[in-house]
């Protein structure tokens, strides 16, 4: 039986921990068992129980206080993640070997972990060796994405993670419940965007022809290949959360290997009568 994992990624403040907490509660209402692993060594607080916490292995504060290392916040976090990559046996012992696991990995927000460093790629490969089907879940703050150029910046961040990790990925706009009605209408065009028309709407923002050509080339890459699309995530809307979960489940083929109960005898009789009915209709025609 395969195991399933979501790598919950995104910039700092995009709502990764809130997403994990909300998704755990939502899955509980669906009678689905979901666990969370915290992979952020700089995390201070989260309101959900964790299966494993990287801070039990190493913490950013301890690294920064080590005078022999002399790391700042970013350097300390990179050091922690590289140390983690050299100690995957700790994670394996925390996860155990239970079949049909469904685990959310709450990841750090530093984008260089996905674009410049191989740490997260190593994690994906290790999880796949442990028979996990892995889906990336990249979050961006919807309040940040209401302008065309900011939206393009978020698209490129999501695309860089997608290209680097080489796994199925769902891109999500979070905090939709915090938007005003006017902002919600404005942001609808960014969920399934026409990149070219977005650039045409802001011609006065281009300060040089080179910048315009670069922007048009990036928009063409995203638009022509339909590489990045976003799903809205409103934690107050059960249907919205269902849609997000269904997209992720489809990406990792969740449920295809679940064992189903055998039909009872009366159900078998009904199915036989159902087949006979259609056979009779075929004979008549």
UniProtKB/Swiss-Prot annotation:
Q: Where is the composition biased (Acidic residues)?
A: 265-277
Top-level taxon of origin: Eukaryota
Q: Which organism is it from?
A: Xenopus laevis (African clawed frog)
Q: Where is this region: Disordered?
A: 261-285
Print the keywords alphabetically. Answer: GTP-binding, Hydrolase, Nucleotide-binding
CDD domains in alphabetical order: GPN3 (cd17872)
Q: What is this protein called?
A: GPN-loop GTPase 3
Question: Where is the motif Gly-Pro-Asn (GPN)-loop annotated in this sequence?
Answer: 72-74
Residues annotated to bind GTP: 13-18, 174-177
Residues the UniProt record annotates as site (Stabilizes the phosphate intermediate):
74
Family to which the UniProt record says this protein belongs: Belongs to the GPN-loop GTPase family.
**The keyword Hydrolase belongs to this UniProt entry's keyword annotation:** yes
Question: What InterPro entries does this protein map onto?
Answer: Gpn (IPR004130), Gpn3 (IPR030228), P-loop_NTPase (IPR027417)
Instruction: Give the transmembrane region(s).
Output: none
The Gene Ontology terms for molecular function here are:
GTP binding; GTPase activity
Q: Summarize the protein's role.
A: Small GTPase required for proper localization of RNA polymerase II (RNAPII). May act at an RNAP assembly step prior to nuclear import.
Pfam families assigned to the protein according to its UniProt record, in alphabetical order: ATP_bind_1
Segment forming the signal sequence: none
| Assembly with partners or alone | Heterodimer with gpn1. Binds to RNA polymerase II (RNAPII).
